[in-house]
């Protein structure tokens, strides 16, 4: 989360499943919807989730007790159907996902880099 705040990134893209074929592929780095979790000096709130067929969209709020206090909204786009060691069977799903990411990035005033 330090890198996210340092680079002032507001959009995160995740293209892996958490578990595939019974194997952990990614450690969940965010709390469940409506909950907060501390990551070192940062507190992350998972404020909202919207689940779609191929992806999940989340809105996080990251804060840090500092002088001045830090608070930032982060948009997390999680593509859930990209197979390990393969490519998605439906290119339309990938294109829709990319469109959503681009629209989100364009809608932000100073979005910083997209973190993938």
Curated annotation (Swiss-Prot):
GO terms for cellular component: cytoplasm. Residues 1-116 form the Tyrosine-protein phosphatase domain. InterPro entries: Non-rcpt_Tyr_Phosphatase, Prot-tyrosine_phosphatase-like, PTP_cat. Pfam families: Y_phosphatase. SMART domains: PTPc. GO terms for molecular function: non-membrane spanning protein tyrosine phosphatase activity; phosphotyrosine residue binding. Its EC number is 3.1.3.48. This is Tyrosine-protein phosphatase 14.
